[in-house]
Amino acid sequence: MSPNSKGVEILSIGTELLLGNIINTNAQWISEQLSQLGLNHFRQSTVGDNCDRIVRVIQEISKRSNLLITTGGLGPTPDDLTTEAIAKSFNVTLFERPHLWDEIKQKLPNSKLHEDSSSLRKQCFFPKNAQIINNPRGTAPGMIWEPIKGFTILTFPGVPSEMKTMWEETAYDFIQTKFSDTYSFFSNTLKFAGIGESSVAEKINDLLNLKNPTVAPYANLGEVKLRITARAKNEVEAKNIIKPIKEKLKQEFSKFIFGEDNDTLPSILIKELTKRKQTIVFAESCTGGLLSASLTSISGSSQVFQGSIVSYSNELKHLLLDISEEKLAKYGAVSEEVCEAMAINVKKKLRADWAISISGIAGPNGGSQNKPVGLVYISISGPNNYITTIKKQFNSTRNRLEIQTLSVNVCLNSLRLILLSDSK
């Protein structure tokens, strides 16, 4: 986009967004796409399903931007008002595109067409000169339309899978050709575990003021990310700009960096175990299967993950994991002694190379003075009778799911570090 351009705006339409019923992932995804295209994206708006309000917002945007991208409000229901509101904003008539009705009829069963033909048909009406954006995944097409000189509107349905497909198949090339200049933004994200955001930021203070590339830290629960973004003519040039900063960070934080971009702790652990042709099992108590779910959510986990025993009660710890009643009575389920026995025994029972066990108090109830909420024991059992136990005391003000999620991250990262040290 040229230096004199007014920029791009995103307009998200839907009362459900204002009520907080759904998270606006569409705007986030489109923002990333615009950044990759090197476009100036300065503002986002959200408006409910009210035609007059949508009209007012569109008219305001048309005075300050070159390109408007809308999501939501396309479809057959009475509250799908986007196309109607756009037409009203510029005082134009909507015309039916008969071929679109033919396409809708092919996508839906006859019974549905008979019941809702009039409401479904409203999806076929567009301004006279609008270019249609086909929707391979649904019935609601979008459009590319320039209602006034220097201002273009692209419309998409609110369903993320439909919007993304339409963007990738039609809109991306159009925007790149018409609006993108010779420079684009390229980002590379480094992911950290076992270190806090403030500790990372403190060590990279000199990098935070860079202009090209820029370096920005941000945190999710249990991990820190550093996004390095370069403005360049192509990806090769961008990689060359990013490379020295990336190498400096890897030297500074070697063991804390577990991956890049789309990597996750589960995917990295699966990769490392697959490389070694080793298997893993779990014995879970306070996480209730969350550790197992983190691994099985990744394609390819079956190559390394054998299974798990979720033994929430003391009775099942005794019956399924052979933890003696005497040990449970003496030390309690949340203890180093019981957690170690869980790891050793599940590894033996399920015949794996590695085992992780976890037992703790996730809260908000169940804590005591000696064993407060947030206390978690994690044991890792491995080849050659290897055993180690990690004791964590998470902040008791965290909610139950946060403590469980942080516990899972510690499990995965701890084994990652063990494998890393073993390979040296």
Curated annotation (Swiss-Prot):
Record Pfam families: CinA (PF02464), CinA_KH (PF18146), MoCF_biosynth (PF00994)
CDD domains attached to this UniProt entry: cinA (cd00885)
SMART domains registered for this protein in UniProt: MoCF_biosynth
Cross-referenced InterPro entries: CinA, CinA-like_C, CinA_C, CinA_KH, Competence-induced_CinA, MoaB/Mog-like_dom_sf, MoaB/Mog_dom
Domain of life assignment: Bacteria
NCBIfam families per UniProt: cinA_nterm, molyb_syn, PncC_domain, PRK00549.1
Family affiliation: Belongs to the CinA family.
Stated name of the protein: CinA-like protein
Organism field: Prochlorococcus marinus (strain MIT 9301)
